Amino acid sequence: MSTLIQLKINPTMPNTVDSVLNSLFLSSETKSLLILEKWINELCETHSISSEKYGNILIAVTEAVNNAITHGNLNVIDKKTIVSYALNDKALSFFIKDEGNGFDFNNLPDPTDPANIETPDGRGIFLMRHLSDDVTFHNEGSFVEILFDL
């Protein structure tokens, strides 16, 4: 059974950065992914993350946020996605929380199955799992933790 994790989403703070909490609050729109990319760039530069790790981080976290916006928040612009991170000398972890109801993350189609090869979506979680060192879902899937060993 997964642990219940709650983050309060503040609807009055679209697309803002809380540097004390290392958090980014995003509205559910495509341009939020550009804001996320800039935030990840700055974070990785500030903390001297290797270029090899940077690419994996950028793709995996962007996939998670895109899923949160599209599938969790259903592209409802007033719904927010919170992205935060924690860093120590061994790992960099990202936490992505949306306002959706979650999903059955234990019952996903295999994107490498020949029947799914031509399907236009369904690869985000597969990429997240292969580009990071650990992916953990909480709150029935509306909260994801992605860990990168350093």
Protein language model regions, located:
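Short alpha-helix lining the ATP-binding pocket of the histidine-kinase-like ATPase
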Residues: T62, N66, T70
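Conserved short strand/loop->alpha-helix "switch" segment adjacent to the catalytic nucleotide/phosphoryl-transfer site
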Residues: I40-T62, I117-E118
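Long cytosolic heptad-repeat coiled-coil signaling/dimerization helices
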Residues: K31, I35-K38, E52
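STAS-typified acidic loop motif
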Residues: N22-L34
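Conserved beta-strand-loop-beta-strand hairpin that lines the nucleotide-binding pocket
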Residues: S2-N22, I69-L150
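Acidic-residue sensor for enzyme active/binding pockets
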Residues: E37, E63, E145
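Structural signature of the histidine kinase catalytic ATP-binding subdomain
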Residues: S28, I49-E52, V76
